[in-house]
């Protein structure tokens, strides 16, 4: 039987493989969630560069949020990363949730990014 860590790694690899299959050169919106914060970045895998990034640790958000570990904070990060991506000229992305299920904070970030101007 696989350990929990191995299960997460397999799920992340499976999702990443699916994302790359449908990407067609589009950058990906990668999400990482920890117990206290949430991070998002737009990555261009073709060139190997990060085009935009945001997290609950950003100076723009840190003082405004009650905590970095709730859906409101995730929505603020989604809106901020979308704003920065549009400023960088990126509107079409592929959503990469990693090993995290599309629920709660990950879903709040994705919906806020869509409202902010990203399409996926």
Swiss-Prot record:
GO terms for molecular function: 5S rRNA binding; structural constituent of ribosome. One of its GO terms (cellular component) is cytosolic large ribosomal subunit. InterPro entries: Ribosomal_uL18_bac-type (IPR004389), Ribosomal_uL18_bac/euk (IPR005484). Coiled coil: none annotated. Keywords: Ribonucleoprotein, Ribosomal protein, RNA-binding, rRNA-binding. SUPFAM superfamilies: Translational machinery components (SSF53137). Pfam families: Ribosomal_L18p. It comes from the Bacteria. One of its GO terms (biological process) is translation. Belongs to the universal ribosomal protein uL18 family. This is one of the proteins that bind and probably mediate the attachment of the 5S RNA into the large ribosomal subunit, where it forms part of the central protuberance. Part of the 50S ribosomal subunit; part of the 5S rRNA/L5/L18/L25 subcomplex. Contacts the 5S and 23S rRNAs. This is Large ribosomal subunit protein uL18. It comes from Brucella canis (strain ATCC 23365 / NCTC 10854 / RM-666).
